[in-house]
Every structure is written in structure tokens, then in C-alpha cells.
Amino acid sequence: MAFKTCGFSKKWLVIAVIVMCLCTECYCQCTGGADCTSCTGACTGCGNCPNAVTCTNSQHCVKANTCTGSTDCNTAQTCTNSKDCFEANTCTDSTNCYKATACTNSSGCPGH
């Protein structure tokens, strides 16, 4: 007795796997867009990047490790021209660098 797979063939399975891999790759980097919540790698010019590791000219980068020209960089370790870098070790032209040990033209730095 043969087992029928509801009309799916190996060809469709291969296509589905390729599409899945391509979509997964898209989550790594996002460029532009109002909502990049699915991006986990890098955001550039995005409006909402709460899960990205790296943010450039983006907003709401609450989990980013590195921020450049971005906002809400709450946990970033390195901030350049960014806002709300509460945990940053290094701040350049950034704001609210409360724990920074190296500050250049930034606000909120300890001892400044």
C-alpha cells in the first residue's frame, strides 16, 4: 500500500525549504522600514528594532550591542551619536551614558 502525501512532491518540499532559508536570512539584516522587530542582526534606517544586535540610524534599539545614530540604545556597550545609552562603556556624541568609562562629547557620563 502506497502512502500519498496530499499532492505534495519532493519538488515542493525543496522549494519550501529554500524559501524558508531565504526568509530566515532576511531576519539577520534589515534596511529601512517602519517595523523591523523580526531583525536580530543589524538594522539600518529602521523605525523599530528592539531585537537587533547592531543599529545604525534606527530607533528603539533596546537590545543592541552597538548603536550609531540611533535611539533607545538601553543596553548598548558602544554608542556613537546615539541616545539613551544607559549601559554603554564607550560613548561618543551620545546621551545618558551613565556607566561609561570613556566619554567624548556625551552627556550623563560619571564624573563629568
From Swiss-Prot:
One GO CC annotation: extracellular region
Organism: Tenebrio molitor
Assembly behavior: Monomer.
Family membership noted in the UniProt record: Belongs to the insect antifreeze protein family.
SS bonds (residue pairs): C30-C39, C36-C46, C43-C49, C55-C61, C67-C73, C79-C85, C91-C97, C103-C109
Domain remark in the UniProt entry: Forms a right-handed beta-helix that is stabilized by disulfide bonds. The building blocks of this beta-helix correspond to tandem repeats with the consensus sequence T-C-T-X-S-X-X-C-X-X-A-X.
Superkingdom field: Eukaryota
Keywords annotated in UniProt: Antifreeze protein, Disulfide bond, Repeat, Secreted, Signal
Keyword Transcription: no
Keyword Signal recorded: yes
Name of the featured protein: Thermal hysteresis protein YL-1
Xref: Pfam families: AFP
Function: Contributes to protect body fluid from freezing at subzero temperatures. Lowers the freezing point of the hemolymph by about 2.5 degrees at a concentration of 1 mg/ml. Binds to nascent ice crystals and prevents further growth.
Segment forming the signal sequence: 1-28
Subcellular location: Secreted
